[in-house]
């Protein structure tokens, strides 16, 4: 917060004397290596208070993506700094009429595309929980372009599963600011002297080949970069599909022995092992082993 009032703030802080404005100035930059990719790290310092902000960018040319994240640091020695809002970053699109497509839904009806015209003002999508059907994925296209295999698409996603928000603000001149990160809902971050905090990453991308290429890009990026898909994973068996909530020690050991014989390397008891969990209406979140089902407890 600070500078032009027309820009949506990415960092909002309150200092000991209740000053709430930032005056961040460029101080230095460095180019680092993160695996096979380059990371640009730009240091901004406040002109009056001991707050340093690092804007970090990792370029992934193989996927036409840029990852961005922010680190804030209290470099003072005396006073705490209260962070009221800290997003992962933003990007701007030139003045035009744009349509936003994002995903919504509910249990059993996940990832339903929703498309809307972005008019002047702010369109916010957000989540206050951890459900998978609340996706931060977005795709921005010029109004009227709907071809799956051709046309401009600006796209991205926040790499975070907690409470989050994405803002799409169209200004009076038609320019579009896209920003996103942790949603500081009924919360704040207190930085003590010497303490720092790093936001989750947000990724941005662009293609001229429609939303089909967006799907392919994210599939490859998730598999090869986020999940490091080249690593060999163990063969897993999940007993949920055989027993549901009706589990007990003798039964699960018997299934595990059979699973081992066919080459399973990791056996998972998914649900029903904790107290009160006999159906999907109780017990969830009470992670105490039900000794009636597992008298000897559970351990790796």
Per-region residue spans from a language model:
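Short Pro-Gly-centered flexible turn/kink motifs
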Residues: 8, 12, 17, 21, ...
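Short acidic, Pro/Gly- and aromatic-enriched capping/linker segments at domain boundaries
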Residues: 175-191
């Amino acid at each position: 917060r600070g500078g032009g009032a027309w820009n949506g703030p990415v960092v909002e802080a309150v200092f000991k004397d209740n000053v709430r404005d930032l005056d961040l100035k460029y101080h230095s930059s460095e180019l680092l290596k993160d695996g096979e990719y380059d990371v640009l790290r730009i240091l901004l310092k406040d002109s009056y208070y001991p707050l340093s902000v690092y804007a970090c960018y990792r370029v992934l040319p193989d996927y036409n993506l840029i990852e961005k994240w922010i680190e804030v640091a209290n470099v003072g020695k005396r006073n705490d700094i209260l962070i009221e809002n800290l997003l992962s970053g933003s990007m701007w699109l030139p003045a035009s009429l744009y349509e936003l497509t994002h995903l919504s839904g509910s249990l059993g009806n996940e990832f339903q595309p929703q498309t809307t015209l972005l008019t002047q003002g702010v369109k916010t999508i957000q989540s206050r929980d951890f459900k998978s059907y609340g996706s931060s994925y977005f795709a921005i296209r010029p109004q009227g372009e709907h071809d799956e295999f051709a046309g401009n698409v600006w796209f991205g996603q926040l790499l975070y599963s907690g409470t989050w928000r994405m803002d799409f603000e169209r200004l009076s001149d038609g320019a579009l600011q896209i920003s996103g990160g942790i949603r500081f809902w009924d919360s704040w971050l207190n930085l003590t002297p010497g303490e720092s905090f790093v936001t989750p990453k947000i990724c941005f991308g662009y293609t001229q080949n429609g939303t089909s290429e967006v799907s392919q890009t994210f599939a490859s990026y998730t598999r090869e970069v986020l999940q490091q898909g080249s690593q060999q994973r163990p063969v897993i068996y999940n007993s949920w599909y055989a027993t549901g909530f009706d589990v007990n020690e003798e039964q699960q050991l018997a299934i595990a022995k059979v699973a081992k014989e066919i080459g399973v390397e990791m056996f998972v008891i998914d649900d029903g092992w904790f107290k009160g969990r006999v159906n999907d209406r109780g017990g969830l979140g009470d992670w105490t082993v039900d000794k009636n089902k597992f008298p000897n407890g559970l351990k790796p």
